Amino acid sequence: MAQDQGEKENPMRELRIRKLCLNICVGESGDRLTRAAKVLEQLTGQTPVFSKARYTVRSFGIRRNEKIAVHCTVRGAKAEEILEKGLKVREYELRKNNFSDTGNFGFGIQEHIDLGIKYDPSIGIYGLDFYVVLGRPGFSIADKKRRTGCIGAKHRISKEEAMRWFQQKYDGIILPGK
């Protein structure tokens, strides 16, 4: 009977965006970092979080526990909207290397003003990294605190599935790796 009406797709196998992580690494604390935080706040409408350096790197002039980057996690419809803007800047082209083995992908852009934010001379221009975490219904069992479950091997997302999803959803082009 299922073949008569055409193959129905299992709704639990449907891929979707779990979260979009945006990151601006300035490499120093101070005024440039607070301006980068303003850029992320303008883009997402959320308060960004500061990241600290793990260890001291004297050649870069970075001290341990010094705030050097700012990041923000966006979910839901807002994540899809921001991702659409970012992919438009990249002209919907990603490399095969941009996709991880766990089915996630990331890319960077050179200038935040390409996303449609008006240029402000007091803020300047910053590049930012996009990282997209894909998931399926049922992935939350691995994240819960009590009675944590494992995601089965057949339910995990492969690199090929993520690339196929990107091509179908955004009509994206995947270039060969470097």
Curated annotation (Swiss-Prot):
GO terms for biological process: cytoplasmic translation; negative regulation of proteasomal ubiquitin-dependent protein catabolic process; negative regulation of protein neddylation; negative regulation of ubiquitin protein ligase activity; negative regulation of ubiquitin-dependent protein catabolic process; positive regulation of gene expression; positive regulation of protein binding; positive regulation of signal transduction by p53 class mediator. One of its GO terms (molecular function) is structural constituent of ribosome. It is found in: Nucleus, Nucleolus; Cytoplasm. The modification Phosphothreonine is found at T44, T47. Pfam families: Ribosomal_L5, Ribosomal_L5_C. There is a cross-link at K38, K52, K154 (Glycyl lysine isopeptide (Lys-Gly) (interchain with G-Cter in SUMO2)). GO terms for cellular component: cytoplasm; cytosol; cytosolic large ribosomal subunit; cytosolic ribosome; extracellular exosome; membrane; nucleolus; nucleoplasm. InterPro entries: Ribosomal_uL5 (IPR002132), Ribosomal_uL5_C (IPR031309), Ribosomal_uL5_CS (IPR020929), Ribosomal_uL5_dom_sf (IPR022803), Ribosomal_uL5_N (IPR031310). Its main location: nucleus. Keywords: Acetylation, Cytoplasm, Diamond-Blackfan anemia, Disease variant, Isopeptide bond, Nucleus, Phosphoprotein, Ribonucleoprotein, Ribosomal protein, RNA-binding, rRNA-binding, Ubl conjugation. The modification N-acetylalanine is found at A2. The modification N6-acetyllysine is found at K52, K85. Belongs to the universal ribosomal protein uL5 family. It is linked to Diamond-Blackfan anemia 7: A form of Diamond-Blackfan anemia, a congenital non-regenerative hypoplastic anemia that usually presents early in infancy. Diamond-Blackfan anemia is characterized by a moderate to severe macrocytic anemia, erythroblastopenia, and an increased risk of malignancy. 30 to 40% of Diamond-Blackfan anemia patients present with short stature and congenital anomalies, the most frequent being craniofacial (Pierre-Robin syndrome and cleft palate), thumb and urogenital anomalies. Component of the ribosome, a large ribonucleoprotein complex responsible for the synthesis of proteins in the cell. The small ribosomal subunit (SSU) binds messenger RNAs (mRNAs) and translates the encoded message by selecting cognate aminoacyl-transfer RNA (tRNA) molecules. The large subunit (LSU) contains the ribosomal catalytic site termed the peptidyl transferase center (PTC), which catalyzes the formation of peptide bonds, thereby polymerizing the amino acids delivered by tRNAs into a polypeptide chain. Component of the large ribosomal subunit (LSU). Part of the 5S RNP complex, which is a LSU subcomplex composed of the 5S RNA, RPL5 and RPL11. Component of a hexameric 5S RNP precursor complex, composed of 5S RNA, RRS1, RPF2/BXDC1, RPL5, RPL11 and HEATR3; this complex acts as a precursor for ribosome assembly. Interacts with PML. Interacts with MDM2 (via its RanBP2-type zinc finger domain); negatively regulates MDM2-mediated TP53 ubiquitination and degradation. Interacts with NOP53; retains RPL11 into the nucleolus. This is Large ribosomal subunit protein uL5. It comes from Homo sapiens (Human).
